[in-house]
Structure formats: C-alpha cells, structure tokens
Design a protein with these regions (language model features):
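N-terminal cap/lid segment of alpha/beta-hydrolase-fold proteins
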Residues: 1-27
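The serine-hydrolase catalytic nucleophile loop
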Residues: 40-53
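Active-site glycine-rich loops that stabilize anionic/oxyanionic intermediates
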Residues: 31, 39-42, 204
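Alpha/beta-hydrolase active-site loop
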Residues: 46, 80-101
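Catalytic histidine-centered segment of alpha/beta-hydrolase-like enzymes
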Residues: 232-245
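Short beta-strand/loop motif that positions the catalytic acidic residue
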Residues: 194, 200-202, 206
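Conserved alpha/beta-hydrolase
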Residues: 51-76
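Hydrolase active-site cap/lid region
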Residues: 127-174
C-alpha cells in the first residue's frame, strides 16, 4: 500500500500543485525521491503509472502540474506565459521543495520526464548535475527548437518572419515568448552537461518527435542507455509501459548504465 498527499510550492508568486506517492509504512530513515514531469498540454496524471511503480520501489514520487503547461492542471498561471524557461523554473522549485522534506534523501533524487517534460528535465539535470542521481527520459521533445525555426511549434503553422503574438497549437495556445525562448537554442548543448546515468526510451514510430532526436541525444550524453521501443509512438500503451517499467527497474538497480 502507498499513500497519496497533495503538495504545493511556489515560483515567482505562482503556486505549483502536485501529488506525492510513497509507501505507507513505518520505514526508518530517509527515502529516495523521484520527480516526474509531464509533457506539453498534459498534467500530473500522465506519468501516474510510473509514480506508483516508483513508490512501490521505495521512492517518494512527486507528480505536478506545470504553471500554464496544461489544460486540466491545478497550478497557477496561463499558457500564454509558459515557456521552456518557466517550466525549468517550476521544476527547480519542486526539486527544492522535495529536497527540504524531512523524509527524503537529497543525495538520491531521480528525475523523469516525458516529451516536453523530458526536454525540461534534461535542461535542469544539466544545470543542477550534482543534485540528480539518475535521469529517465521518455520521447523527450528535443525537436522544439527546430519546430520554432520552421514555424511548426505544437503542430501549428505560422510565418517565422511574422510570428503571431498568440500561436494556436493543438490543445494549448502559447505566445510569441515561447517561440523566442527556444528558436536559437541547441537542445543537445543544453542537456549534455549532465554526466550521470541516463535512460532514454523512444518509440520507433513516433510521429511527433522523430527517433533521430533520441539517437543524437544518446550521442551527446556521456552515460546514456538508449532503448528504441519498436512499434511505439509518442506515448506508450499500457502493454508498452509494462515493458518500459522493466527497463526502469533495471536502470534503478544500476544495471542499466
């Protein structure tokens, strides 16, 4: 059995809300912690399967809604103010909160992210490499800067010489600020500063983030295990998640480096 607890922390006056999952036990001492980051337009429940599995492994697992990053999220903020930089700031605030809890071990923190949350996780891990013990990325959206350069952010189509103030993407409108924050970025340079163990899992049939981005990321990292999930797209089915969690368990035990 595990317990659920709502938590909140703040960033620049905005409240970030999430859920903690951990074993309901009389465990002595501090436990390792895992922070999980959802993708563009998603919410904290997108990675719930993995949070519960991590809790069963003895982790205190934390899922949260990015500020302005999702339609059904509970955190403050507008999607028109959301950028990769604001999401990185959100994640850092959650990390600081988790590290400050009396029952978590700040020396054993795992970071997991999917899609845009994977890109953000990669950036934060590189900026705070000494704080992250292991990094797990599912189909990270390292294509975002290229999408900005071609006017196709979030599935939209716009003229890069006349960038609209509001970009109508699938699901969530974003602003010109988002475009401007990523258009000149090299995502592989942004993430390669993390030299700890990385597990990167990507679908062979991903039509949103081509698998070539995962292959390039694996080359950029110093210590990365890349797994291509045959037949999988952008997001995994329950059957595929069952396979993925086997790799996650192996990686956590230290055999997936």
């Amino acid at each position: 059995m595990f317990m659920e607890r709502e938590f909140c922390c703040t960033r620049d006056g905005l409240t970030i809300r999430g859920t903690e999952y951990r074993e309901d036990s009389e465990r002595q001492g501090r436990c390792p912690a895992a922070v999980l980051c959802h993708g563009f337009g998603g919410n904290r429940y997108d990675l719930l399967f993995y949070a519960k599995e991590l809790a069963a492994m003895g982790y205190a697992a934390y899922c949260f809604d990015f500020c302005g990053g999702c339609v059904a999220g509970k955190s403050d903020g507008s999607s028109l103010d959301m950028t990769i930089d604001t999401e990185a700031a959100d994640l850092k605030a959650v990390l600081d909160y988790v590290k400050g809890l009396p029952y978590t071990d700040e020396n054993h923190i795992l970071l997991m992210g999917g899609s845009q949350g994977g890109y953000v996780s990669g950036i934060v891990a590189a900026e705070r490499p000494d704080e992250i013990e292991r990094l797990i990325l599912f189909y990270p959206a390292l294509c975002i800067p290229d999408a900005a350069r071609t006017g196709t952010l979030g599935g939209a189509h716009y003229d890069v010489n006349r960038i609209p103030e509001v970009i109508r993407t699938f699901g969530v409108p974003i602003s010109k600020k988002f475009h401007d924050s990523v258009v000149d970025k090299d995502p592989f340079s942004q993430i390669c500063g993390y030299r700890g163990p990385v597990l990167l899992i990507h679908g062979s049939e991903d039509m949103i983030v081509n698998v070539s981005y995962a292959r390039q990321a694996a080359e950029a990292y110093e210590n990365c295990g890349l797994e291509i999930l045959q037949g999988a797209g952008h997001g995994f089915t329950q059957e595929q998640r069952e396979k993925v969690i086997v790799s996650v368990r192996r990686f956590i035990k230290g055999r997936g480096e």
